[in-house]
Amino acid sequence: MQKVSVITMTYNDLSHLEKCAGQVLKQDYENLEYIIVDGGSTDGTKEFLAQLREQYGEKVTYVSEPDGGLYDALNKGIRMATGDIVGLMCDEFADKGVVSRMVSVIEKEGTDGVHGNINYVSGEKVVRRWRMGKGSIRTGWMPGHPTLYLKKEVYETYGLYKTDYKIAADYEFMIRILKDKKVSLSYMDEVLVHMFHGEESASTGGFGNYLKSLKEGHRALTENHVTFAWTVDFCRIMRVLLQFIKR
């Protein structure tokens, strides 16, 4: 049975962490390692992490110390990971069988990773549905990062997240691994993640963050030598608008 490492990054957001950790530790996949990277919180997070470690033993690994931000924390978690398959979770899995189904699909299809759909939620209400589908980065398509679970060897081959990006290092990383079409992904046409919307989560942001993301995204395209970068930018914007229309 392949080992799966699930990584959560957190900083002074205990209530959110409690929800997230509860969902991860309810997963029915047995060979699961849960890694929590805390940026040195002062809100009781360290005490909560110690309780998780005491309750779940070696299944839970954590570190609590200052870091260089979201992507530095994610890189730290990847380095700590001992699993064959690695992914992040800073929100909630859709149900307790998500990880089991992910592993099953990767093994059945012989791919390097898997991704699926996302629902953005506020409380009990779904405010946006994001069906990722299949596509090409040249048409503005990109896997939903919170649903992306990859074999660790992909990170070993292509490197980690670039910390000089502040908001779009995930986009740059996905361009880097997908542009030459050597990394194969399976698509699961189902909701894998419920993503907290607005103030409930650091995973979503406002229009200002979206503009910053577009700027850094264009930089990522040019640095990775993707031709017609402005066309890709336009396609990305249109895909986002269509998601809002369909919600």
Give the role of each language-model region:
Residues 1-206:
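Nucleotide-sugar donor-binding/catalytic module of glycosyltransferases
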